[in-house]
Amino acid sequence: MFELCLRIKNWHREAGEDLHIGVLALQGDYAEHINMLQSNNADVSEIRLPSQLDDVDGLIIPGGESTTIVQLIDIYDFRTKLVEKASEGFPIWGTCAGMIVMARELTDHRPEPLNLMNIKVSRNAFGRQIDSFEEDLTIKGIDGKFPAVFIRAPIVVENDSSVDILCSIDKPSGPVAVQQGKLLATSFHPELTNDSRMHEYFLSIVKM
């Protein structure tokens, strides 16, 4: 696992060159991810049909309303395709609700996640929208502190040895950034900051 956790150095606007990244555009804050990727010179497509996944090098599942996103994934027949792509080593990054979607299991057993990563997740672990906050985090693979925005965020409550913990916090206690091969999940919203280093980190995974 450690070989995938690269130190991101000298990655700026060139990070996304020669890469075509998809952002699942069924619901949620996909536009903010698109803007961040484009600032790193990546070619970006809004993904609305499963067949489009074959045309991109990696996928971001954005934050939003997890139940709605899963319902739309099933309505548009994404589930089987996403599971197949993940098993083939296709890079996927889920942020906030995207982490919930990628989980093996949820503490409240709804909605039914895709079981892409060996993690059990608690939804809304940090409270309601009014309890949103920002915290500077130390994240494995990222130089310096990262300003993480938490909005009704989930947290990982169980994981197996195949999952690399990139960052944990104390209250509530648990991982908020995890990686399993080329699958990445974060509880927080990097796309809502002016800091592109988490996106650069994902682009480095895609380039592996």
Give a label for each model feature:
Residues 18, 56, 88-90, 111-112, ...:
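Short coil/turn connectors at secondary-structure junctions
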Residues 2-15, 123-208:
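Amide-donor transfer/coupling interface in amidating biosynthetic enzymes
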Residues 61, 94, 186:
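Redox-cofactor binding/interface segments in oxidoreductases and associated redox assembly factors
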Residues 66-138:
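Cysteine-nucleophile active-site neighborhood
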Residues 44-45, 92, 183:
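Hydrophobic anchor at the start of a short beta-strand
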Residues 26, 97, 188:
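Cofactor-binding loop segments of dinucleotide-utilizing enzymes, especially the Rossmann-like FAD-
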Residues 30, 53, 101, 108, ...:
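Flexible, glycine-rich phosphate/dinucleotide-binding loops
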Residues 1-75, 80-85, 196-200, 204-208:
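N-terminal beta1-alpha1 cap of cysteine-dependent amidohydrolase-like domains
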